[in-house]
């Protein structure tokens, strides 16, 4: 053993202050095998500074002989992230590293003092498939000190192993028979938390739960009184997310290092595993909320599964279980949950569709679906987080009669760190949840609103069953972000941290003094008054577009009803008793000159008359400009079409024209000449000088449209007629409006055909040139 023991040279990184305590924090050390002057093998730790994410060794490794290269292991990088509270703390860190002859593993032993009992050390490697099953770890308590020893095999691939020693309580994920490696359970924010009788569960689950309940000393289960259990569904299976510490050390893709190391816990003493002490309040902001489960050695021993919790009610219940187990108290102060009548018809059989957690008697059971294989669709669904999707508050899972396979394991050790961030709050919703929400909305209309005095839990069972999904996300009674406290550290089995700034709490803030039934009635009224919010929550992009179309249709119907009402008032004023239908005749093209406009403008008000006269003069000036300037390039045409259409739509929206449909149809069908004139006609808010400038701008842009001179006067006539009818009839009768729309469509089609023919002639001329 003495021959194999190797000395370690710990060279601190050179820093400006010269303080040795700073080199321990945030430095990288590379283990290099060298040969000493006496011929013995040495392990030398070389400091590696971090510059812009790249690892650069300060000291080059010495050259080894070819005879020793065969037994050389891969380099191991040791990272220390130590938070030194005071300057009096010893800066020296002893890392005795030795290698026995029968093994190629490096054993790193470190002494942890009493002030760092909350330290959790995680061991990671770049290649999990080759060396992960060989990693071994055990801890021994000696007089308040904890000795942590790791056996890290060198990686068989080119990537190097690394060890992360972190003071911020990174959880160590232990292998579980229920879930494969690198996965944990996720309780989503929209999970359903309810209290159901044990008789509603499948028979196999009842046998397991009742068997543990009768053997426990907390209370005997009588035959006449069926106990109630807490049912949490759905529970998803997701992959572990890499923490920020790993990202800082290795700037690799997340997929390469996202899985935690699986530790073989057969050598861990039971008292050490079950009594992990956490320093209160010092939890990493980046560490996920996980349940750490111990590996089961026998078929009926409890197993440990990592779990994330995003549900406030579930966190409250788990915290209550932990407090009861720590204090030795059998009473549980449960949050207000709606219960199901044990004598109800629905409670006889409650088939389970999704994975669920059942909490009873201080123990947590996992109910898995039959034939679930890590559920890859759920994993992809959890990874595709859409921040724009709001969290739905009233998910009622539609249950079916699919058989379930009961996998129940007792929880032995739960260590929870603080939640990572609120990015896991918003989850993409599955199709079954969308359908179930529609069913809930349909059934909710049938439920009578309960009176505030009705507080009997044994009331109508069907209404209670509907209401239980609405009391899921009430504001919890306990303060947000509670911790165990710095001054009074104690042995805890689990600590739950509620999310700060949760979206759920900002939407529903209900006093804790209100009982469950009153809360349910309030929430029922609140949700019935906001169907639009549910529509936006449950709809996809297609449904959103359909909702906008429905909104436009409803606005159109309301406008039409308003027109009918005002039409009836006009008929009363003028003494009309019959419906009149106005027939419009088309004005010939040769009459649509400037003089023809003056005869029509005499009927218009003074403001409109000035505007019309100005438009006529500008139209004549435009014709002259067309005659003078015909030889512009035609490739400018496509560059400005989109810009003009956008300006046209914007002007129509700003000015609030009565005939929005006509202007939109115009901007989509007419070429640029009509669009520019329509812009000038509809911009009533602009001054005369601005209109003149805009007219000249469009005139210079469309010099290539000289062949359309014959249509210019006709188009001005068309637009004048439109403006004329809008000014004289502010509220157009429905029949007249339909006639005008049909006439406009016919004219637009004709203009389109004429201009297409003109463009074709221009193309032929250019081709001939």
UniProtKB/Swiss-Prot annotation:
Residue ranges annotated as motif Nuclear localization signal: 628-631, 642-645
GO biological process: dosage compensation by inactivation of X chromosome; regulation of DNA-templated transcription
An example Gene Ontology CC term for this record: nucleoplasm
Residues spanned by motif PxVxL motif: 580-584
Primary site of residence: nucleus
Positions bearing Phosphothreonine: 732
Localization per Swiss-Prot or TrEMBL: Chromosome; Nucleus matrix
GO molecular function: nuclear retinoic acid receptor binding
Domain of life: Eukaryota
Coiled-coil boundaries: 740-769
Quaternary context: Interacts with RARA. Interacts with SMCHD1; leading to recruitment to inactivated chromosome X in females. Interacts (via PxVxL motif) with HP1 (CBX1/HP1-beta, CBX3/HP1-gamma and CBX5/HP1-alpha).
Domain notes: The Pro-Xaa-Val-Xaa-Leu (PxVxL) motif mediates interaction with HP1 (CBX1/HP1-beta, CBX3/HP1-gamma and CBX5/HP1-alpha).
Family in the record: Belongs to the LRIF1 family.
Protein name as annotated: Ligand-dependent nuclear receptor-interacting factor 1
Native source species: Homo sapiens
Gene transcribed to yield this protein: LRIF1
């Amino acid at each position: 053993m003495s021959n194999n023991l190797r000395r370690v040279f710990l060279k601190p990184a050179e820093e400006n202050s010269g303080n040795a305590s700073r080199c321990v924090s945030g430095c990288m050390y590379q283990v290099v095998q060298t040969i000493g002057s006496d011929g013995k093998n040495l392990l030398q730790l070389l400091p590696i500074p971090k510059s812009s994410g790249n690892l650069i060794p300060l000291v080059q490794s010495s050259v080894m002989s070819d005879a020793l290269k065969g037994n050389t292991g891969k380099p191991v990088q040791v990272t220390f992230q130590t938070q030194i509270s005071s300057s009096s703390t010893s800066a020296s860190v002893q890392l005795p590293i030795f290698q026995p002859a029968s093994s190629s593993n490096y054993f790193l032993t470190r002494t942890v003092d009493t002030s760092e009992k909350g330290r959790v050390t995680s061991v990671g490697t770049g290649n999990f498939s080759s060396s992960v099953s060989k990693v071994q770890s055990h801890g021994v308590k000696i007089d308040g000190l904890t000795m942590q020893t790791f056996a890290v095999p060198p990686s068989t691939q080119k990537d190097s192993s690394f060890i992360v020693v972190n003071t911020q309580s990174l959880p160590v994920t232990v292998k579980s028979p229920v879930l494969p490696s690198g996965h944990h359970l996720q309780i989503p924010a929209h999970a359903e938390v309810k209290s159901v009788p044990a008789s509603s569960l499948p028979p196999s689950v009842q046998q397991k739960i009742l068997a543990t309940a009768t053997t426990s000393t907390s209370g005997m289960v009588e035959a006449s009184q069926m106990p109630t259990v807490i049912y949490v569904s759905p529970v998803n299976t997701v992959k572990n997310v890499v923490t920020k510490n790993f990202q800082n050390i290795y700037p690799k893709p997340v997929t390469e290092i996202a899985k935690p190391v699986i530790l073989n816990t057969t050598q861990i003493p039971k008292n050490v595993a079950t009594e992990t002490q956490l320093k209160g309040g010092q939890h990493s902001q980046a560490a996920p909320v996980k349940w750490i489960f111990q590996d089961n050695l026998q078929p009926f021993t409890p197993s440990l599964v990592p779990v994330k919790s995003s549900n406030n009610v579930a966190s409250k219940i788990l915290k209550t279980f932990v407090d009861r187990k720590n204090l030795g108290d059998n009473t549980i102060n449960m949050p207000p949950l709606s219960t199901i009548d044990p004598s109800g018809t629905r409670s006889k059989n409650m088939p389970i569709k999704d994975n669920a957690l059942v909490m009873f008697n201080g123990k947590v059971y996992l109910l898995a679906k039959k034939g679930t294989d890590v559920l890859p669709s759920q994993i992809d669904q959890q990874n595709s987080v859409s921040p724009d999707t709001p969290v739905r508050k009233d998910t009622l899972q539609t249950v079916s009669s699919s058989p379930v396979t009961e996998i129940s394991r007792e929880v032995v050790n739960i260590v929870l760190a603080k939640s990572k961030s609120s990015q896991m709050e918003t989850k993409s919703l599955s199709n079954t949840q969308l359908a179930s929400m529609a069913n809930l909305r349909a059934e909710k209309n049938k439920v009578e609103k309960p009176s505030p005095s009705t507080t009997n839990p044994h009331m109508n069972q069907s209404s209670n069953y509907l209401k239980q999904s609405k009391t899921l996300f009430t504001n919890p009674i306990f303060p947000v972000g509670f911790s165990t406290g710095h001054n009074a550290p104690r042995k805890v089995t689990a600590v739950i941290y509620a999310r700060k700034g949760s979206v759920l709490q900002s939407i529903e803030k209900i006093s804790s003094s209100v009982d469950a039934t009153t809360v349910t009635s309030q929430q029922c009224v609140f949700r019935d008054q906001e169907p639009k919010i549910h529509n936006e929550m449950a709809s996809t992009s297609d449904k959103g577009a359909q909702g906008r179309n429905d909104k436009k249709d409803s606005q159109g119907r309301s406008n039409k009803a308003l027109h009918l009402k005002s039409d009836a008032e006009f008929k009363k004023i003028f003494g009309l008793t019959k419906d009149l239908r106005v027939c419009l005749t088309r004005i010939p093209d040769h009459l649509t000159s400037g003089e023809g406009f003056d005869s029509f403008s005499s009927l218009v008000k003074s403001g409109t008359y000035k505007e019309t006269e100005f438009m006529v003069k500008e139209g004549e000036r435009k014709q002259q400009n067309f005659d003078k300037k015909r030889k512009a390039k035609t490739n400018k045409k496509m560059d400005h079409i989109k810009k003009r259409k956008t300006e046209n739509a914007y002007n129509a929206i700003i000015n609030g024209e009565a005939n929005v449909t006509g202007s939109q149809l115009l901007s989509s069908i007419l070429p640029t000449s009509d669009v520019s004139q329509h812009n000038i006609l509809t911009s009533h808010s602009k001054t005369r000088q601005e209109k003149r400038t805009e007219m000249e701008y469009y005139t210079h842009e469309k010099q290539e449209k000289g062949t359309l001179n014959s249509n210019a006067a006709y188009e001005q006539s068309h637009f004048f007629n439109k403006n004329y009818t809008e000014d004289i009839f502010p509220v157009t009768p429905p029949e007249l409006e339909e006639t005008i729309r049909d006439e406009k469509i016919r004219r637009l089609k004709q203009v389109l055909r004429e201009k297409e023919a003109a463009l074709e002639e221009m193309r032929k001329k250019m081709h001939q040139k």
